[in-house]
Amino acid sequence: MLINFTKMHGLGNDFMVVDNLAGDITFNAKKITNLANRAFGIGFDQLLVVETSNIRGVDFRYVIYNSNGSEVEQCGNGARCFARFVNYKNLTHSNPITVKTRSNIISLHLNDDNTVCVDMGKPSFNPADIPLLVPQQSEYYQIEGFDLGAISIGNPHCVMLVKDVNTIDVNTIALKIQQSELLPNQANIGFMQILNTHEINLRVYERGSEETLACGSGACAAVAYGVEQGLLKKNVVVHLSGGDALIEYTQGGHIFLSGPAQFVFEGQVEI
């Protein structure tokens, strides 16, 4: 079957985006991993699929697959690309655009400068929502010998405070943490260096995709944790390898992610 696709990225976190409103395209893990291969396929961190919603007031179903073929709950950078895609393809003229992910409903607002602001919902520090198998909620948890904050942004995140993100062995540490029995669904692992109360450096090892140039939900998780710990103010610039994301979070409220979403190319591929 020959399908149309669009290649996009948000701060270097790259995506293959597909319109499946007709419901005639079926993906499986083998197809996805083949398409994600950067040497023999399209190459991407995540596959984003636009599907119809059966929920009143919700414009689309936003389906996300990691490059290993696993379906995941949330992707903030992908949400920005999703918004620009459905607008560019004239699939909707709504603004904001409301979409249903695997875990929750989020709102996407297109700005005049082609950036997108995503209402990522309310972060949860409840271990059951992550899930994290611990007896009670705490400011931090010791997992595989590391002190970590744990947060759900609709998907699971752990955050480690570090002095310098450039000297951390991200892959080795993240893989060790992900193997913990305390994290039955694993987690995205963020390494946060606080520069001041409005600015951080961040690297994120994404579950199912390894380290990426940017992770929107990871940026939200890091800022939410920093605000809750009194280390950050409500407006924070997050410096990622692929560029800067802007996060706004008031303790106990919703968290907002703003940043660019870029088109790279379009094409057709046999699946």
Swiss-Prot record:
GO biological process: lysine biosynthetic process via diaminopimelate
Principal cellular location given in the protein's record: cytoplasm
Marked site: Important for dimerization: 265
Binding, substrate: 13, 46, 66, 76-77, 155, 188, 206-207, 216-217
Positions bearing the site annotation: Could be important to modulate the pK values of the two catalytic cysteine residues: 157, 206
A GO molecular-function descriptor: diaminopimelate epimerase activity
Localization per Swiss-Prot or TrEMBL: Cytoplasm
Active site positions, chain numbering: 75, 215
Keyword Cytoplasm: yes
SUPFAM superfamilies linked: Diaminopimelate epimerase-like (SSF54506)
GO CC, alphabetical: cytosol
Known pathway: Amino-acid biosynthesis; L-lysine biosynthesis via DAP pathway; DL-2,6-diaminopimelate from LL-2,6-diaminopimelate: step 1/1
Catalytically driven reaction(s): (2S,6S)-2,6-diaminopimelate = meso-2,6-diaminopimelate
Keyword line: Amino-acid biosynthesis, Cytoplasm, Isomerase, Lysine biosynthesis
Enzyme class: isomerase
E.C. number(s) listed in UniProt: 5.1.1.7
Keyword Isomerase among UniProt keywords: yes
Described purpose of this protein according to its UniProt entry: Catalyzes the stereoinversion of LL-2,6-diaminopimelate (L,L-DAP) to meso-diaminopimelate (meso-DAP), a precursor of L-lysine and an essential component of the bacterial peptidoglycan.
Subunit comment: Homodimer.
Protein family: Belongs to the diaminopimelate epimerase family.
Name of the protein in question: Diaminopimelate epimerase
